């Protein structure tokens, strides 16, 4: 990753553990720190995954180590090559690279099967014929262990049945392979957990070669060990699974002994990050797709105009801890606003246009003004914008009759500045038969070029933005808001669909933007003066049909 794009890695407890491992030597003596990011290719990555990516790849970078990308494709039910490709694109977009270390868990299926056979031979696994319903009954409760009637099945019989399971002789759910561990354990994950289940389903990579698939708790430690992972960084949800992780490593003849470390997931308010719920939003047409700019998916955030640096800084500033917490969505917006304020060039765009006619400006005449592109980056220079007798301004910048504290245009009201151009004063307006304002009339001060009257008088009205009507370009502008009205839409027994925000998208099809934006292409972002930060839509925008998405407004609602 380029140095200028790297966030500053703060100290966190994972680094403390790794420092301790290195200092103590032992199995980590002289070893390169080796991590992995192992998404399941059954959906698109979201902002929560961005934190895991940051932790996995960032930790490897900190220690000069390696980080693998591994597709955890052990469940063929919803996995697809579409997601495999999207995951790679998202990680590269964030600025990380796996350096050719790209693996699929399914490529280890044969080796995993061999390890399972070894466990059976050692008397540490057996084939169980309990149905899913019976399985729950035989798990017992906290105080009462429950024993499968198949637990003492002869080793040879389990070996035979397991081979026949692989051969496809039995239907889904007929049998499982279970580890033989501790029926009295207070950790239910250790009460003879399932290692393999039957699933007659086509696999996106292995085709129909397999009809038995390893459970995550069995596959995960084996994958880590086979790849030489030193530190397996997982979400806190797997803390209770660590004893099983260690049991698998200890009882299979694997080439490495990774250490699992758990950290808290990233939670954000006003959204959901369950893949199941995100898929439901897509499949029910509640959003336009996985890349809908209101979605927390990385492709959705990218389409909305979020930058890799903003997301990395957001992930880094939230830190890494064991304590689960929910972060304000406003903080994510703050990180984007902070980045775009520094990098985005300024432009003028009128979202709800009304004509402004400067009655004392010569007809047929025009001129240009030099306007700075970004006050924070002098190296970005300036651009020329045209000015003529007819302009477009925002409809909200005019009122037929004033209201208290209104500082913009109204008949015989105070003088106002046209941004970077002239001082004007409203003299009247025109309406259609229905009484709708169709044009605003004003006069300008020819001696106020640049916005400052030659006589030094104070301009009491506001400064408003504008676009030259003669050269303006048509555009569609989409204003996005939170997808949910509830800060915790999936908390408790809430139906998250009942919390959807009916006003999360407003489309303005008749916006006018300055001529210099005619050739704008994704992923370009701009600050539209007085409006917010906008990006060119990477899906619907095209020559002759510009589409801009509001990424974030100008006002920062986040409080430190």
Residue spans for each PLM region:
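N-terminal catalytic cores of NTP/NDP-binding nucleotidyl/phosphoryl-transfer enzymes
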Residues: 9-18, 23-88, 202-235
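Secondary-structure transition/capping motifs at alpha-helix termini
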Residues: 24-29, 58-66, 92-99, 122, ...
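Intrinsically disordered or highly flexible coil/loop and linker segments, enriched in small
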Residues: 27, 96, 125, 171, ...
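Conserved short loop/turn motifs at secondary-structure junctions
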Residues: 38-41, 70-78, 100-110, 133, ...
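Active-site cores that bind ATP or allylic diphosphates and position pyrophosphate for catalysis
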Residues: 69, 73-75, 118-277, 336, ...
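A glycine-rich helix N-cap at a beta->alpha junction
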Residues: 83-109, 115-116, 123-125
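Core subunits and conserved enzymes of cellular information-processing
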Residues: 238-242, 246-248, 312, 316-319, ...
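Long, charged, mostly alpha-helical binding arms that flank functional sites
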Residues: 256-335
């Amino acid at each position: 990753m380029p140095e200028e794009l790297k966030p500053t890695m703060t100290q966190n407890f994972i680094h403390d553990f790794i420092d301790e491992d290195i200092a103590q030597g032992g199995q980590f003596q002289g070893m390169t720190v080796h991590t992995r990011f192992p998404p399941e290719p059954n959906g698109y990555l979201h902002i929560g995954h961005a934190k895991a990516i940051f932790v996995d790849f960032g930790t490897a970078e900190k220690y000069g180590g390696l980080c693998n990308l591994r597709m955890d494709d052990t469940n063929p039910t919803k996995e697809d090559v579409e997601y495999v490709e999207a995951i790679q694109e998202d990680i590269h977009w964030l600025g990380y690279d796996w350096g050719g270390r790209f693996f699929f868990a399914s490529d280890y299926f044969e080796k995993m099967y061999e390890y399972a056979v070894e466990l059976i031979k050692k008397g540490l696994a057996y084939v169980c014929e309990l149905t899913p319903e019976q399985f729950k009954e035989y798990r017992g409760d906290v105080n009462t262990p429950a024993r499968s009637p198949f637990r003492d099945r002869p080793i040879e019989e389990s070996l035979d049945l397991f081979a026949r399971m692989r051969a496809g002789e039995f239907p889904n759910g007929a049998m499982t392979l279970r580890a033989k561990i501790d029926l009295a354990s207070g950790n239910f994950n250790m009460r003879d957990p399932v290692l393999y289940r039957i699933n007659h389903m086509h696999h996106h990579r292995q085709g129909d070669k397999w009809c038995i698939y390893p459970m995550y708790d069995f596959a995960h430690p084996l994958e880590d060990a086979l790849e030489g992972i030193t530190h397996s960084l997982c979400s806190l949800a797997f803390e209770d699974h660590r004893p099983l992780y260690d049991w698998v490593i200890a009882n299979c003849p694997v080439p490495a002994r990774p250490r699992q470390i758990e950290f808290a997931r990233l939670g954000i308010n006003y959204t959901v990050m369950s893949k199941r719920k995100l898929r439901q939003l897509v499949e029910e047409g509640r959003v336009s797709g996985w890349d809908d700019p209101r979605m927390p998916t990385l492709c959705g955030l990218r389409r909305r105009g979020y930058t890799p640096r903003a997301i990395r800084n957001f992930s880094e500033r939230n830190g890494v801890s064991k304590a689960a917490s929910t972060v304000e969505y406003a903080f994510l917006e703050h990180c984007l606003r902070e980045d775009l304020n520094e990098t985005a060039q300024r432009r003028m765009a009128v979202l709800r246009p009304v004509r402004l006619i400067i009655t004392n400006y010569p007809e047929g005449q025009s001129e240009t003004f030099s306007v700075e592109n970004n006050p924070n980056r002098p190296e970005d220079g300036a651009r020329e914008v045209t000015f003529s007798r007819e302009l477009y301004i925002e409809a909200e910048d005019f009122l037929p009759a004033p209201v208290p504290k209104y500082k913009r245009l109204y008949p015989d009201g105070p003088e106002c500045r046209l941004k970077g151009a002239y001082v004007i004063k409203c003299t009247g307006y025109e309406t259609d038969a229905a009484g709708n304002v169709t044009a605003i009339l004003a006069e300008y001060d020819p001696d106020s070029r640049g916005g400052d009257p030659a006589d030094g008088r104070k301009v009491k009205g506001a400064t408003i933005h504008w676009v030259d009507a003669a050269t303006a370009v048509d555009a569609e502008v989409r204003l996005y808001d939170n997808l949910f009205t509830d800060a915790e839409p999936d908390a408790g027994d809430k139906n998250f669909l009942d919390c959807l925000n009916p006003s999360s998208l407003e489309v303005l099809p008749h916006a006018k933007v300055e001529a210099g934006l005619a050739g704008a292409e994704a992923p370009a972002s701009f600050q539209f003066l007085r409006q917010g930060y906008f990006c060119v839509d990477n899906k619907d925008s095209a020559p002759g049909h510009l589409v801009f998405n509001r990424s974030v407004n100008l006002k920062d609602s986040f409080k430190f």
